[in-house]
């Protein structure tokens, strides 16, 4: 038998050597992949940043406001980074296509930002700080998923970054149908989403959660044809044109709660009445409309509440009289719909009011406050919904 050269080894040894070389190549390839992957992971990790938590605390449904169908809701931002972050822009996006459904920057963004406490630099959110963005945009088609992109800068640097979040699908439109809360007119629908201390912006955290009960609240104040709201300088509640007007049930409903006996100031002083938060409503009535919806009538005249809890009322029944109790700048009827029988611990809901026509509008709250004339339009019936901000209306049916 011929000798086998040690150099070549036995057939078994040769096979093992070949396997060893292949195994070595596989290990080398694996090592290259690992090194490459580590580089990729390192690059990706360097791009990850702490920034804003973006939440939509209440999922909206479309609302008819002044003949326009809109989504009215809020973004809650919390800064979880170690840096102060300066807000630059906010976009509401179609979550599927990325198309912008609404954009805010500059002065429009400034006007949409709400902060708790005194914060002169509204766009600058310190570490651990919070901001609320109050949004109103044309309602998208049913089923569209919304997302939001926040562009921000790191304070004191030239770094700018985007972050996306706050995805939701709007609820289907399902406003409760209501009748007029008052008779005749002209009555002014006092509300505007841009007012910094208006109902739309006042958040309450009274039960371990933050709520916005007045999201769609309206303060109704009666005026005359020339825009005045009182027969004198307005210093006496009884001289306001709407004072003592009958307040009407807006639907067939069950009385859910009442409060009466809150005293009324004898004079109307500049600025809102200073009262404890629990007394802000003054005398009030709430009606259970069913389906988890309640309507509130606030600031009623002392001794005027005519109903009691558990009582059934019909649309158009008199339930009280317009007054000047609680936190109020003057005699008016505050009305809103919410998802719980709690004046403050509930979420404000849209509604569809019928039985009114629009006679005109005030061009600004300053014009109204000065008692100047409102702009008269050709009177037009309005489809059920909510009147527009500062619309002047006449209620035409019970």
Show which residues each predicted segment covers.
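Zn2+-dependent peptidoglycan hydrolase active-site motif and core
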Residues: 254-301
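Intrinsically disordered, low-complexity Pro/Gly/Ser/Thr-rich segments with frequent PxxP/GP/PP motifs
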Residues: 103-141
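A structural signal for short beta-strand/turn segments enriched in small hydrophobics and glycine
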Residues: 253-255, 310-322
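Asparagine-centered strand-capping/turn motif at beta-strand->loop junctions
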Residues: 77-81
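Short, solvent-exposed loop/turn segments enriched in Ser/Thr/Gly
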Residues: 57, 67-74
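Short histidine-centered loop motifs in beta-beta connectors
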Residues: 248, 289, 293-316
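Short glycine/threonine/proline-enriched tight-turn/helix- or strand-capping micro-motif at secondary-structure
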Residues: 58, 199-249, 258-278
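Acidic, glycine-rich catalytic/binding loops that coordinate metals and/or anionic ligands
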Residues: 172-192, 198-202, 231, 274-277, ...
């Amino acid at each position: 038998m011929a000798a086998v050269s040690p150099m070549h080894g036995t057939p078994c040894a040769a096979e093992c050597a070949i396997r060893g070389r292949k195994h070595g190549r596989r290990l080398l390839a694996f090592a290259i992949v690992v090194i490459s992957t580590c580089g990729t992971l390192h690059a990706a990790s360097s791009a990850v940043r702490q920034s804003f938590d973006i939440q939509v605390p209440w999922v909206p449904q479309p609302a008819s406001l002044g003949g326009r169908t809109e989504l009215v809701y809020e973004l809650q931002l919390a800064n979880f980074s170690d840096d102060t972050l300066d807000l630059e822009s906010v976009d509401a996006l179609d979550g599927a296509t990325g198309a912008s459904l609404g954009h805010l920057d500059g002065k429009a963004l400034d006007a949409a930002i709400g902060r708790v406490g005194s914060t002169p630099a509204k766009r600058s959110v310190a570490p651990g700080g919070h901001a609320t963005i109050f949004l109103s945009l044309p309602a998208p088609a049913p089923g569209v998923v919304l997302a939001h992109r926040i562009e921000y800068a790191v304070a004191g640097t030239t770094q700018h970054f985007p972050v996306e979040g706050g995805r939701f699908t709007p609820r289907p439109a399902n406003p409760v149908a209501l009748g007029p809360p008052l008779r005749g007119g002209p009555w002014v629908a006092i509300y505007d989403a841009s007012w910094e201390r208006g109902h739309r912006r006042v958040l309450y955290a009274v039960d371990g959660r933050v709520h916005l009960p007045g999201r769609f609240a309206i303060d109704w104040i009666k005026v005359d044809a020339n825009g005045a709201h009182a027969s004198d300088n307005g210093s006496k509640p009884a001289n306001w044109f709407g004072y003592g007007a009958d307040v009407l049930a807006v639907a067939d409903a069950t009385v859910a709660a009442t409060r009466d006996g809150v005293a009324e100031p004898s004079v109307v002083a500049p600025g809102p009445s200073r009262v404890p938060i629990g007394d802000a409503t003054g005398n009030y009535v709430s009606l259970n409309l069913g389906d988890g919806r309640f309507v509130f009538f606030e600031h009623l005249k002392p001794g005027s509440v005519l109903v009691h809890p558990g009582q059934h009322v019909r649309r158009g029944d008199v339930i009280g009289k317009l007054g000047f109790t609680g936190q109020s700048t003057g005699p008016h009827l505050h009305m809103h719909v919410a998802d719980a029988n709690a004046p403050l611990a509930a979420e404000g809901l849209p509604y569809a009011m019928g039985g009114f026509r629009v006679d005109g509008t005030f061009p600004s709250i300053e014009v109204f406050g000065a008692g100047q004339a409102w702009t008269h339009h050709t009177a037009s019936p309005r489809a059920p919904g909510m009147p527009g901000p500062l619309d002047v209306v006449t209620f035409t049916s019970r």
